[in-house]
């Protein structure tokens, strides 16, 4: 078992997240707030990636993705 997340895995999911964030828009104030939070976690991911803290980078990416999917499922973003 390894305790490291491969950099390539973080980059892969960050790229997918970037595409997703570029393709959605808010339908409400709640949706706009959700997107702002998702973008903040995306930015955190980039920061931790530069710092080579792959665990925190991946965690921030996952949080961002979860916010986007939740807002999408609630109909707050399209």
Regions found by a protein language model. Give the residues of each.
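Amphipathic, heptad-repeat alpha-helical segments
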Residues: 1-35
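Conserved small-residue packing positions in alpha-helical repeats and bundles
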Residues: 38, 43-45
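Short, charge-rich amphipathic alpha-helical segments embedded
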Residues: 65-78
